[in-house]
Regions:
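TRNA-recognition modules of translation machinery and tRNA-sensing kinases, especially anticodon-binding
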Residues: 1-131
Length: 131
């Protein structure tokens, strides 16, 4: 009857459900599943028209196992930095027009305050040193 409730037509159906939280808990008790809590690196937004570049950078970083978040919205850099500090991000990536053209984003370590402009290839290793 569930299909009829949502789709207003009868259709044969079969289903199954598991309690995901219970499954994860059971796996953690058996020490076969560990949740690694990582804080995301934040990519700061300078121009919404560059979203494709931000997403490409995020894809590269996530593919390398780095938790990454693109700043959700359009705000001045100060607000974006406040957001990164609020979520306790270990670092931010400044990837504005000049950085996109040069292919060298600026990585700012939020713990030390140091920042450097580096190639995307080097970015992964530098972030891993920070996190």
């Amino acid at each position: 009857n569930l299909v009829n409730n949502f789709g207003n037509y009868d259709a044969p159906a079969t289903g199954i459900s598991i309690g995901l939280d219970r499954l994860v808990y059971a796996l953690m008790q058996k020490k076969e599943f560990k949740i690694k809590q990582t804080r995301p690196v934040v990519i700061c937004i300078f121009d919404k028209n560059s979203m494709k570049e931000y997403i490409n950078l995020q894809t590269i970083l996530r593919g390398s196992g780095i938790s990454t978040e693109i700043y959700p919205g359009e705000s001045k850099l100060k607000k974006q930095m406040e957001y990164a500090n609020k979520i306790k991000a270990p670092a931010v990536i400044l990837y504005g027009e000049n950085e996109i053209k040069s292919g060298k984003p600026t990585l700012r370590d939020l713990n030390s305050g140091k920042e450097k402009s580096i190639s995307i290839k080097e970015l992964v290793n530098e972030i891993k040193k920070i996190i």
